Amino acid sequence: MRVDLFDFDLPEDSVALRPASPRDSARMLVVRPGGEPVLEDRGVLDLPSFLRQGDALVFNDTKVIPAQLEGVRYRGEHISTPVSLTLHMRVAPDRWKAFARPARRLKPGDRVSFGHGGNACLLGSLDAMVEEKGDAGEVTLRFDLSGPSLDEAIMSVGHIPLPPYIASKRADDARDRTDYQTVYAREEGAVAAPTAGLHFTDRLFAMLDEAGIERHFVTLHVGAGTFLPVKADDTDDHVMHEEIGHVDAVTAAKLNAVRERGGRVVCVGTTSLRLVESAAAEDGTIHAWSGATGIFITPGYRFRAAHMLMTNFHLPKSTLFMLVSAFAGLETMRDAYAHAIATGYRFYSYGDSSLLFRKD
């Protein structure tokens, strides 16, 4: 499909720079393809009223790490211009793949030192060597530290990697370390938050429990590739980034039991949906699964396991707007987004939410 079919005009002031407070006070646009009404303006706290006893919410419990690193490149005895690197996938205890800016100033063999400029690492300087250079600004870094020691150093010198549309408007601060993290995050490794989950609070969980809604957790470590623009003119020519995920056998069995008794699998966020669909067989049976997924969902995809999707509002021509268009229908989602923009919904990671029913 032509990528420009997924384009729309998004005013700059529609992008939220801070989350709603409290988290569960965000607005929620309910989208029912072919329903009456198709679009309904509600709030996140209304979520339980759209679910039935026995339905199951699926959350991504990945935890964001401060993966934005500001460093200085060394080549021989010469110090060059500062470089910025966003870690996006760990490939070994001492190695990370990262996106570099400006990538043209790095080559294999270069050394990069982090943690200077008043933010020194408590363990000493954090240094890495550029081991490989790939496409689209990607490099592989081999750090001098490894395992937990490296994790501690990254926590000390790193910054929360705010999405570009937010980072271009303001710098990250101490609030983001809390705001850009779900209350149930536990598995460290993401460099972007599963943002649909940011709306959940203890109050909302209590309401869902009272309504008899199950909750289950899977893990997909969201990578910085989620921010990459689609540069191809046709979706067939786009290469999707891969992310590491895991669905354990107990969770798979419980979700299959929900489906067998007529309950619905409600994915909280596109990351949960992509992982559940990666783990599902053609008949919708969900299996234990672990590995890298590069699943790219566009209109025409036949959903196997997910019945409903709660998700924030996405950017024009993004792979995530393509995904929601596949789920609820392109024209329905174009109408939904036009309504959201006209009525002041807040977009992107810190923005409002939508609840999508799957198109038949």
Swiss-Prot record:
The keyword Nucleotide-binding does not apply. One of its GO terms (biological process) is queuosine biosynthetic process. Its main location: cytoplasm. One of its GO terms (cellular component) is cytoplasm. The keyword Oxidoreductase does not apply. InterPro entries: QueA, QueA_dom1, QueA_dom2, QueA_sf. Transfers and isomerizes the ribose moiety from AdoMet to the 7-aminomethyl group of 7-deazaguanine (preQ1-tRNA) to give epoxyqueuosine (oQ-tRNA). Belongs to the QueA family. It comes from the Bacteria. Monomer. Disulfide bonds: none annotated. GO terms for molecular function: S-adenosylmethionine:tRNA ribosyltransferase-isomerase activity. SUPFAM superfamilies: QueA-like (SSF111337). Its EC number is 2.4.99.17. This is S-adenosylmethionine:tRNA ribosyltransferase-isomerase. It is found in: Cytoplasm. It holds the Pfam family Queuosine_synth. Pathway: tRNA modification; tRNA-queuosine biosynthesis. It catalyses: 7-aminomethyl-7-carbaguanosine(34) in tRNA + S-adenosyl-L-methionine = epoxyqueuosine(34) in tRNA + adenine + L-methionine + 2 H(+). Keywords: Cytoplasm, Queuosine biosynthesis, S-adenosyl-L-methionine, Transferase.
